[in-house]
Amino acid sequence: MAIDENKQKALAAALGQIEKQFGKGSIMRLGEDRSMDVETISTGSLSLDIALGAGGLPMGRIVEIYGPESSGKTTLTLQVIAAAQREGKTCAFIDAEHALDPIYAKKLGVDIDNLLCSQPDTGEQALEICDALTRSGAVDVIIVDSVAALTPKAEIEGEIGDSHMGLAARMMSQAMRKLAGNLKQANTLLIFINQIRMKIGVMFGNPETTTGGNALKFYASVRLDIRRTGAIKEGEEVVGSETRVKVVKNKVAAPFKQAEFQILYGEGINIHGELVDLGVKHKLIEKAGAWYSYNGDKIGQGKANACNFLKENPAVAAELDKKLREMLLHKGNELTPATAGNSHDEDAFADEGNEEF
């Protein structure tokens, strides 16, 4: 439908005035927005990148990762940092829990010499540091570990037992309003790690909730629920954990998918195991009995040996990773259980309770 010529002139004048006052790009037609193609950073897990639909976590957005204790939350964020650093990006870790282990971070591939780290005294200080780093435009990824440890100044200065109802939620709400726009402008990814609490007196539905009020749930473009589902054993020794991550909220692709992978103690996400499993599923790796073959060449007898081959031959692993990403991610948000490997859809209604945390 054609717009009246007078209206077109009035609209052009209004747009010109807005751009003059607020700067070029302050208003535009949606189809002209070059930022529609979202830049992403890998999570370090191929199946999780596929479940996210966009190939990783979106830059310029807020992400929340929550789960029970020892479920792999910090490990996952350290893998994100390692992936970002490999791309030459600058990363910062706001360690509000004062529990970051640099030796473990180094084992996961993090360049600790170039990782910015802060251990703030108060929640307000932590969030101000986040804002200052974002406004600098020089930091690409910021991790806050964790929301539960962001203690308001009034609570720290008060006595144990004093009531501070709603202080943390109000602090987070103010911070979200301030940070969201700055993150978009700077194209900085901000990841909040969060803990789980139980609602008292819930008879029906999910009694679990996350700390810090509701603001983070609304402002987050992606929310990931990470759970430990089992143990990995070598004989009697536990060497890792089976992990499931559910995409509870996703503003950049289809939500409610989930990914399953292994976290090995001292090594992090077992990416080579994922490559073997997904390669076999999508017929890039041939499996005959116990033998695995790639491009006609045998790479190992048994999954463990096939994984070791990929670990010792990073060029082959990178080639296989590239082929799988091209095959699975180009299907975009229409990924189905048959095409997503370890990633599969969840019933949106079944997960509605999680979304309402």
UniProtKB/Swiss-Prot annotation:
GO BP annotation list: DNA recombination; DNA repair; SOS response
- For the ligand (ATP), the binding residues are 67-74
InterPro entries reported in the protein's UniProt record: AAA+_ATPase, DNA_recomb/repair_RecA, DNA_recomb/repair_RecA_CS, P-loop_NTPase, RecA-like_C, RecA-like_N, RecA_ATP-bd, RecA_C_sf
Name the residues that span the membrane: none
Gene Ontology MF terms in the entry: ATP binding; ATP hydrolysis activity; ATP-dependent DNA damage sensor activity; damaged DNA binding; single-stranded DNA binding
- UniProt keywords, alphabetically: ATP-binding, Cytoplasm, DNA damage, DNA recombination, DNA repair, DNA-binding, Nucleotide-binding, SOS response
Q: Region Disordered: start and end of each range?
A: 333-357
Q: Which domain of life is it from?
A: Bacteria
Q: Which residues form the signal peptide?
A: none
Claim: DNA repair is one of the keywords in the record:
yes
The answer to whether the entry has keyword DNA repair is: yes
Q: Where is this chain compositionally biased, Acidic residues type?
A: 348-357
> Where would you find this protein in the cell?
Cytoplasm
PANTHER family to which the protein is assigned, alphabetical: MITOCHONDRIAL DNA REPAIR PROTEIN RECA HOMOLOG-RELATED, RECA
Q: What is the similarity comment for this entry?
A: Belongs to the RecA family.
Free-text function comment from the UniProt entry: Can catalyze the hydrolysis of ATP in the presence of single-stranded DNA, the ATP-dependent uptake of single-stranded DNA by duplex DNA, and the ATP-dependent hybridization of homologous single-stranded DNAs. It interacts with LexA causing its activation and leading to its autocatalytic cleavage.
Q: Which HAMAP family match?
A: RecA
Question: What NCBIfam families does the record tag this protein with?
Answer: tigrfam_recA
Protein's name in the database: Protein RecA
